[in-house]
Amino acid sequence: MVKINQDLLNSIKEFTLMDDPFMTKVFEDDIERTQLILRIILENDTIKVKKASTQKRFKNLQGRDLQLDILAEKADGTKFNVEVQNESSGAIPQRARYHMSLLDAKSLPKGEYFDKIPENYVIFITKEDVLKGLLPIYHIHRTIDENGHSFADGSHIIYVNAKIHNDTPLGMLMHDFCCKNPDDMHYKKLAEKIKYFKEEKEGLDKMGDVMEKLIAKREKEALEKMAKKYEAKAAKAQKEARISLAKEMLANNESIDKIVKYSKLSVKEVRALAAKMSA
């Protein structure tokens, strides 16, 4: 476990619920607080969460696996997947569709009739207004093109715009999701848990595991970035060498086919070089 020194303590104080590692810790196995945010987002105070977990991995034997930020479930099997996204690219419609598909696949036991599949929800809380409608929340449902009627298949995709902070319950929740100081938060239950992880010794000790994973993740990302940088440089150098060879062969009046064969450039690229050299 990483020992919490002053530098790490300062980093922890900068966390908000929009930061995946911190959000994961705050909502880990926390039915009460998961239920709180679902009731606010869905404007339904009757929602009763039976199970809640974070970083739940969904295996897909024939495709890409998913690791869900928050997964909650009601007694009737209804599932809620809440994802926090700081990057707009991580909240594209196709991703929401894929999350829903796996959520549905995990909701119907073998041999059950299709009408037994429960209603399911995929909720993206996004740092930016991804759908660009200047709205605080977007509800997406399938409709019949010809008459505009609801298809009513029980799937619900919701985008919450975390940029809008106002005096509505949702606006205050988004303020709290973006707030660093628990003393400035609206919802006491969230503030208490955040204060625990940011200020109390027991909570800070538990944050050591989070920081260890975060440091490892950042080191991995740095190495991957460095590898991509050198791969790009190598590719550029290789391209330049091929162009140089092609120019030399053109100067020696070699055939286009021969130049393409040895330089690995395309016919179009070789012809463009030839035109440039003869201009």
Provide a role label for each language-model segment.
Residues V2-F15, F80-Q85, G171-A279:
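Short, charged alpha-helical interaction segments and adjacent helix-coil junctions
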Residues M1-G203:
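Conserved single-residue anchors adjacent to enzymatic active/cofactor-binding motifs
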